[in-house]
Amino acid sequence: MIKGISETLGMPIDNWGETQSDRDYNAYNFSYKSVFGLEDERLPQFVKLETALGSYSFPTRKLEIGNYIGDYLEEVGRTDLVETFGLFKFLMKVQALERTYIDKVFALCDYYIQGKSKRYSRHLYDIYKLSPMMKLDEAFSELIKETRAHRAKMTICPSAQDGVNVPDVIKEFCDKEFYKEDYHAITNYFSADVVAYEEVINNMRKIAESGVFDSFQSIGNGKSR
């Protein structure tokens, strides 16, 4: 099915040989040629489609989805064009920001454990921007536990496994400046609202010291540590 979509779009999957149907996780790179003739390793010439078995969104909320073009056309009274091109707002079930935030913290830990930094420092920026929206209460702590248990079922999520101290992993990649080079090369290049590396790292240290990620998975004998 995915290959058929690629052919219909005229966007060859340039890493097709690296994917396998029996994997929990796959990433398909739908390649394209920039109309501007832009060639920069910081902006890969492909759209990445990621698939993961056993991963599902929770909790979810219904939000109104719109787009800039549709909003503009409504503002200038061209609802005829909005209707012609199907640009009206609609409701969509989306994953709660709290879950996205938690996933990003675990993802940074996963990539550090796996020794992968390239193009992943963007999570530092996202977490920084989302942090003021988070309420670190009991419900949030419970969602962390549920998310960790869910991620622990997937082999690509090592930081969710039993015995891994997430706050320690966060402090370690902060101390070693693991994401610093990538952050300066990628995140600052694309973002119009630049946030200094030191600020996003200080934010991660606060998360590590907050205590909300201190919970551990239960281990064999039913105890937790």
Predicted stretch roles:
Residues 1-225:
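Structured mid-to-C-terminal alpha-helical surface segments
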